Each structure stands twice: as structure tokens, then as C-alpha cells.
């Protein structure tokens, strides 16, 4: 699973760099509001609930935390929004945790796909049928 996590980190950071370059900071409040919309927020909470009790090794946790901090700082330096930075870094943690736990949660795969499509997830997400691992491996080959 280390390879898949490496690929996730690489694609997530690369996509986020492009997202932040293209982001109109005047839209941050709208993005935050859309993420607080019931269906998005509830789906996020449900996905978190599925991995909340999962146990990861110290190395896995440290690896996720390191990238999460990098994502937070990168986002904050471009947006000056601690709320958006927290949301995006927590999204990375959620996606990485589901990947390491090898779960099959189509909403989390859709969350990841939205980032890889260089968009900040909000509102309703386009459904992705592959597992998260399958999705990342397809991206790694492209």
C-alpha cells in the first residue's frame, strides 16, 4: 500500500498546486458554504466514521500527518483561510486513511477524483465506481 499512498501524495499535492494557482480567493466563502451543505457534510462525516477506529502504524500516521501539514501550509499561504486549509488538509487525511484501511467507499473515491480533476470538492460529487486503490493506480499509469 506504500506505493499507492506515495502516488496519492504526489497527485494530491500536484493537483492542489494547480487548484491554488487558479483559485479566485473571492469565492472561498462560497466554497466553504457549499461544503457545509448537508449532503456534502453528512457524506464526509459518514466516511470519517468508517475509519475513525482504524489502527494505523506509527509510520503510516506520521506519513499522513506530514503530508496533511504540508497541504495545510500550502493552502494557507495561498489563501490566508484557516478554514479552507483545514478542510483540504482533513480531506487528504480522510482519503489517505481510507486508502490505507483498504475500504471501498465510493464517496471518498469521488472526493479524491475531484481533487485530481483540479477542483475543490463541494456540493454534490460526481460518482466514481472504482475503488480508491484502483482509481489511484489508474492515475499512476496515465
Residues covered by each model-derived region:
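C-terminal alpha-helical interaction appendages
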Residues: 12, 40-142
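Membrane topogenic helices and adjacent juxtamembrane segments
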Residues: 1-45, 138-139
